[in-house]
């Protein structure tokens, strides 16, 4: 049984700790996006959804209590199940591949798949970092911080500070151009945020709408980037300016069987032609896509030259440049509207967010094949190949 993506939406991406979503629960964001999916799909009732699959990289605290099920109950009702999926930065794309696989296996007809993450509310390491001492003794590289893995990748693959800063500038410039052109407008669900606080013993409140990605710095320059100090290693090349931003956001797509799609008289947007994951040395985790991309191409029976557009998650500029170099990617096809350095990286949401973005840009450019790929903390990579339909 074939599976198709019918539609997809996302929130704008907020700056963690200082942006519009800094006090907003991630399940609140997810509910708004999912309800938009359902409301904009003629004939689809909430009870017709077989499962809600929610990617989340730190499912604890405000993202605990099995956030996938919690979101399903709130968005669609108690009769719709939900689960939480965690493959760190790949979680949002992983949920889409699970939904597709379940439909292809005949296990269901309709899935909501994506992810949600609040990096404002949950720290990067979670609330209790408690690694097994055997990890430190036997596989110490697994515990190396993400910034230091980017430094390791840069050193191994010869990526310079100058190249990293130039790549970061490109990300901001392209993202600013995309926002100015309104490219993200139709895919973003505007979120009304209400804030309440006490000031001078008086209750204060305000409401505002978040409908634009907040991380883009339109005044970024090479001179400004060059002044930033290394963030993780003395003499290193990774700075706050050439690393992805910590972010808040949610994104989901509707995945449906051909049978249900025809029953409802719907048209598909795309199909997932392949999705592969791979393991790499945790010390060089950023190179993960180089291992995953060939596996995905082999699954799809395709050559790299057939891919017309690529969304490569910019965990770090050094990491992205190393992937482009080692995987033989055409830089002009990569992140045509900017990437995570400018637009943000809300961990468990990112894979779905990039899927929504690339499908819309492929439609504008009338392209057939696109790829979403990302490195994954702990030493993994993921790559998904999408075929645009209609």
Where are the predicted features?
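N-terminal extracellular/periplasmic Venus flytrap/periplasmic-binding protein-like
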Residues: 10-12, 23-32, 43, 166-263, ...
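Conserved catalytic cysteine-centered active-site region
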Residues: 24, 56-109, 140-151, 219-245, ...
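Condensing-enzyme catalytic core mediating Claisen C-C bond formation in acyl metabolism
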Residues: 1-26, 221-287, 291, 298, ...
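Conserved N-terminal phosphate-binding loop of PLP-dependent enzymes in the Aspartate aminotransferase
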Residues: 117, 123-124, 128-129, 147-152, ...
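Conserved beta-ketoacyl condensing-enzyme motif
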Residues: 22-133, 188-210, 283-284, 304-326
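Active-site-proximal alpha-helical scaffold in enzymes
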Residues: 87-116, 154-184, 252-259, 324, ...
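Short, well-ordered amphipathic alpha-helical segments that serve as non-catalytic structural scaffolds
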Residues: 26-42, 67-71, 95, 146-153, ...
């Amino acid at each position: 049984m074939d599976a198709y993506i019918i539609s997809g939406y996302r929130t704008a991406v907020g700056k963690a700790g200082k942006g519009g979503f800094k006090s907003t629960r991630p399940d609140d964001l997810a509910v708004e996006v999912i309800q938009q999916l359902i409301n904009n799909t003629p004939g689809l009732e909430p009870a017709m959804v077989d499962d809600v699959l929610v990617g989340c990289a730190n499912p604890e605290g405000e993202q605990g209590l099995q956030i996938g099920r919690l979101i399903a109950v709130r968005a669609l009702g108690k009769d719709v199940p939900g689960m939480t999926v965690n493959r760190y930065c790949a979680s949002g794309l992983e949920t889409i591949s699970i939904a597709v696989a379940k439909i292809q296996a005949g296990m269901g007809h309709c899935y909501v798949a994506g992810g949600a993450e609040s990096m404002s509310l949950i720290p990067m390491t979670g609330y209790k970092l408690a690694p097994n001492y055997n990890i430190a003794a036997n596989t110490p590289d697994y515990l190396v911080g993400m910034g230091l893995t980017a430094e390791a990748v840069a050193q191994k693959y010869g990526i310079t500070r100058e190249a990293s800063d130039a790549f970061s500038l490109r990300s901001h410039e392209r993202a600013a151009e995309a926002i100015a052109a309104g490219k993200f407008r139709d895919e973003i669900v505007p979120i009304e945020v209400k804030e309440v606080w006490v000031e001078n013993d008086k209750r204060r409140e305000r409401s505002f709408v978040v409908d634009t990605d907040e991380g883009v710095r339109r005044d970024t320059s090479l001179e400004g980037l060059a002044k930033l100090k290394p963030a993780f290693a003395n003499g290193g090349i990774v700075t706050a300016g050439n690393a992805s931003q910590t972010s808040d956001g949610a994104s989901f797509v509707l995945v449906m069987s051909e049978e249900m799609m025809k029953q409802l008289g719907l048209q598909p947007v795309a199909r997932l032609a392949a999705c592969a994951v791979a393991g790499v040395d945790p010390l060089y985790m950023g190179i993960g896509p180089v291992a995953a991309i060939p596996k995905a191409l082999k699954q799809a029976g395709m050559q790299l030259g057939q891919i017309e557009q690529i969304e490569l998650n910019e965990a770090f500029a050094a990491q992205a440049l190393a992937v482009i170099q080692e995987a033989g990617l055409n830089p002009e096809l990569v992140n045509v509207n900017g990437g995570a350095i400018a637009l943000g990286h809300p961990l468990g949401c990112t894979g779905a967010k990039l899927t929504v973005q690339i499908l819309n840009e492929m439609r504008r450019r009338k392209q057939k094949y696109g790829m979403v790929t990302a490195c994954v903390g702990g030493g993994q990579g993921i790559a998904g190949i999408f075929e645009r339909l209609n």
